[in-house]
UniProtKB/Swiss-Prot annotation:
Residues 373-384 have a biased composition (Low complexity). Phosphorylated and activated by MAPK1/ERK2 and MAPK3/ERK1. Phosphorylated and activated by MAP kinase p38-alpha/MAPK14 at Thr-203, Ser-253 and Thr-315. The modification N-acetylmethionine is found at M1. Residues 46-306 form the Protein kinase domain. This is MAP kinase-activated protein kinase 3. It comes from Bos taurus (Bovine). Activated following phosphorylation by p38-alpha/MAPK14 following various stresses. Inhibited by ligand 5B (2'-[2-(1,3-benzodioxol-5-yl)pyrimidin-4-yl]-5',6'-dihydrospiro[piperidine-4,7'-pyrrolo[3,2-c]pyridin]- 4'(1'h)-one) and ligand P4O (2-[2-(2-fluorophenyl)pyridin-4-yl]-1,5,6,7-tetrahydro- 4h-pyrrolo[3,2-c]pyridin-4-one), 2 ATP-competitive inhibitors. Keywords: Acetylation, ATP-binding, Cytoplasm, Kinase, Nucleotide-binding, Nucleus, Phosphoprotein, Serine/threonine-protein kinase, Transferase. Stress-activated serine/threonine-protein kinase involved in cytokines production, endocytosis, cell migration, chromatin remodeling and transcriptional regulation. Following stress, it is phosphorylated and activated by MAP kinase p38-alpha/MAPK14, leading to phosphorylation of substrates. Phosphorylates serine in the peptide sequence, Hyd-X-R-X(2)-S, where Hyd is a large hydrophobic residue. MAPKAPK2 and MAPKAPK3, share the same function and substrate specificity, but MAPKAPK3 kinase activity and level in protein expression are lower compared to MAPKAPK2. It comes from the Eukaryota.
Length: 384
């Protein structure tokens, strides 16, 4: 059956009380590679028009396993070498720690075109930073940030041990299994993943706010791209805003490129005043502009701030409050990244490295101006 027809005939979703079970007894083993099933996906799953998200190469829809009633996520990719590469890399990683599992893959027709349909576990807990945003007045601590970074690092370590570079590690690709307190954080979307061999990666595709410096120039890059992204995510976790910004409203600007390539960022007060030196040191090691000097994933996992996360101070951070106050800007940044994902390519000629005495961070400037205005009327302090 054509997928389009199946969507129209999907009918109501199964009731929430239907017991859940594994979506498919034929799910691949850890790191397995398999051929897609050739029969109709609708034989096994009831499709919904509910869009759960947008990946690099295709949209993600809600679906239900007909036998068990379990809610799953379906990603639709039009068949191409790039799509098959995404499926292959995700299949190799599926079942690894803190990585979204593939449950089934089908090869069907959709709009008279051959497509691949990836059935994945449904991540009902939402995005990493949305979860922190929604905490309200409940403090988010440095120890919690360390535990989150350890989980993300565990996923990257699994990939790198199998010579896979994810190349698009960013907040939107980090999802929770549920809204429960003990939900597991997992990495998804292998649309830009590549196997790392003796030929270093050179394809200029990336998400601009989390892109390593060497991606912006003619240098080769490899797994160290993921390490740079870990540094940016860790920075945001500890303060609520990223270290680099485009001040022009573009997804990525020449000024932002220069700041990234020069590694120009700071640890401004008050957001960073109480953050431990161990955390700042780890960020510096991850954001090294020379990929050969950047930490490997093994070194990252062995860093005291990560492997001794239980003794990291429980210092309350500004992160949740900053994310809430700047929610509109954060959404704008995400929209810019989404639109840039599939279309942006690097123009090396625009990269002109000049020494910048200060970093002009648009969001930070706005925050400082607002703080200056409020401090004139009140001497109180917020030590969240």
């Amino acid at each position: 059956m054509d997928v389009e027809t199946a969507e129209e005939q999907g009918g109501p979703a199964p009731p929430s009380g239907v017991p859940c079970g594994p979506c498919s007894a034929g799910a691949p083993a850890l790191g397995g590679r398999r051929e897609p099933k050739k029969y109709a996906v609708t034989d096994d799953y009831q499709l919904s028009k509910q869009v759960l998200g947008l990946g690099v190469n295709g949209k993600v829809l809600e679906c239900f396993h007909r036998r068990t009633g379990q809610k799953c996520a379906l990603k639709l990719l039009y068949d191409s070498p790039k799509a098959r590469q995404e499926v292959d890399h995700h299949w190799q990683a599926s079942g690894g720690p803190h990585i979204v599992r593939i449950l089934d893959v089908y090869e069907n027709m959709h709009h008279s075109k051959r497509c691949l349909l990836i059935i994945m576990e449904c991540m009902e807990g939402g995005e990493l930073f949305s979860r922190i945003q929604e905490r309200g007045d409940q403090a988010f601590t440095e120890r919690e940030a360390a535990e989150i970074m350890r989980d993300i690092g565990t996923a990257i370590q699994f990939l790198h041990s199998r010579n896979i570079a994810h190349r698009d590690v960013k907040p939107e690709n980090l999802l929770y299994t549920s809204k429960d307190k003990d939900a597991v954080l997992k990495l998804t979307d292998f649309g830009f993943a590549k196997e790392t061999t003796q030929n270093a990666l050179q394809t200029p595709c990336y998400t601009p706010y989390y892109v390593a410096p060497e991606v912006l120039g003619p240098e080769k890059y490899d797994k160290s791209c993921d390490m740079w992204s870990l540094g940016v995510i860790m920075y945001i976790l500890l303060c609520g805003f990223p270290p680099f910004y485009s001040n022009t409203g573009q997804a990525i600007s020449p000024g932002m490129k220069r700041r990234i390539r020069l590694g120009q960022y700071g640890f401004p007060s008050p957001e960073w005043s109480e953050v431990s030196e161990d955390a700042k040191q780890l960020i510096r090691l991850l954001l090294k502009t020379d990929p050969t000097e950047r930490l490997t994933i093994t070194q990252f996992m062995n860093h005291p701030w990560i492997n001794q996360s239980m003794v990291v101070p429980q210092t309350p951070l500004h992160t949740a409050r900053v994310l809430q106050e700047d929610r509109d800007h954060w959404d704008e940044v995400k929209e810019e990244m989404t639109s840039a994902l599939a279309t942006m390519r690097v123009d090396y000629d625009q990269v002109k490295i000049k020494d910048l005495k200060t970093s002009n961070n648009r969001l930070l400037n706005k925050r400082r101006k607002k703080q200056a205005g409020s401090s004139s009327g009140s001497q109180g302090c917020n030590n969240q």
